[in-house]
């Protein structure tokens, strides 16, 4: 994908999906432990989410890092807002905040 196409793809994915996880691998088969952790958390909370595998598209990965100003993956978006990566998602899950954030999300 070209840069403009990547930006359009990213914006559409975030806009169309209440919960989207840009990750390495898929929710069925995460390709890194960090992505797997966030998938497990979302599954424990019973949240339906869209997963986008960034592993095989270097340009998309780099453009997403610039778009989000976040250097690592996974990247969790809820209602169009970047929540963060694995450590933040885990912390929010452990203190109950992630469940509150997701409570009003209708997927």
Swiss-Prot record:
Residues bound to glutathione: 24, 61, 73, 86-87
> InterPro entries given for it?
Glutaredoxin (IPR002109), GRX_PICOT-like (IPR033658), Monothiol_GRX (IPR014434), Monothiol_GRX-rel (IPR004480), Thioredoxin-like_sf (IPR036249)
- UniProt entry tagged with the keyword rRNA-binding: no
Record keywords: 2Fe-2S, Iron, Iron-sulfur, Metal-binding, Redox-active center
- Glutaredoxin domain location is 7-107
Where does the sequence pass through the membrane? none
- Disulfide pattern: none
Q: Does the keyword S-adenosyl-L-methionine apply?
A: no
**Which molecular function GO terms apply here?**
2 iron, 2 sulfur cluster binding; disulfide oxidoreductase activity; metal ion binding
Q: Short name of one Pfam family for this protein? A: Glutaredoxin
Query: What are the binding positions for [2Fe-2S] cluster in this chain?
Result: 32
Q: Which family does it belong to?
A: Belongs to the glutaredoxin family. Monothiol subfamily.
This chain belongs to the protein called: Probable monothiol glutaredoxin 2
Tell me the gene name.
grxC2
